[in-house]
Amino acid sequence: MEDSEDKLGKAISDLLSGNIGYSFSSGKAAFATVLDLVETGAHIIASDNLSNDVYKIFESVRRRTSGLTFSYVKDFSQETLKLVKQENTRLIWSESLKRPSFRVPDFESITEFAKANELISVCDNTLATPNLFNPVQAGFDIVIHDAKGYLSGTMDVEGGCVVVAKGQEFIQEKLGFLQRVLGSVLSLDEQKKIITGLNNLEERIEQQSRNAHQIAEFLFSDDTVASVNHLGLKSHPDFE
C-alpha cells in the first residue's frame, strides 16, 4: 500500500499534527512492528501496567524471538529512569493513562530523558484518544492507537495506527519499510469503517466524559462508597 492510499494513517496523523501515519491490520500488529524498530537483544523501559495484549507481545513473543529485555517501572521520574537505564536501552514505552489506576505518567520526564539519551519514546494513546491527549505535542516520537474500540466506535473492526512525529525521518523510513515487508497493512475497506468512526469521535468522547464525570460525582457524594477513582475529581492524585 502506498502512503497516498493510507487515508486512515493520514487522518490520525493530521489529528495529532504528526509527520506521517500508518494504518495496520490490527492494534497488535502495530505494537509488534514498533518493537521491531530496535535491534535484537535491546532493552526497553516500560510502564508496569501495560495492556494485556502489549504485555504478551513483550514477554511471550519478543523476549523469546528477539531477545528483548524489559524493565517495568511504577513511575517515570528522572531518578527511576536513570536507575533502570542500561547501555543497550533503546526505547521507553508508556501509556497515556495507566491501567487500572488511570494515573497520568510524567510525560515531560519521559520525553526529556529519551531525548537526552537518544532513546525512542513511544506512547500508547488508545485509552485517551487524540481528543483527550496529544502525545506528539507532548514530545513523543511515536504514538500508537488500537483502533478497534474508541477510534472506530465499534468493536467489529480490527485496526491499528502509528503516527511518527516530525523530525524523525529515520524512524519513519524504517517503520514504513517494516510495514511493507511484513505485510501488516489495513485494507481500504477497513480504513473507511474506522474513518467513519473518527467523524464522530469528538462528540462520542465528550458525551462519555460528561456521563462518567456525573456518575463519579454522584458516587463520590455517597457516604456508603469507600472511594471513587476518576481523573475529573479533585480527590484524584493527578487532577489538574
Region spans (language model):
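Active-site loop ensemble at the mouth of alpha/beta enzyme cores that anchors a bound cofactor
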Residues: 234-240
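Conserved PLP-enzyme active-site core in the AAT-like
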Residues: 20-222, 229, 235
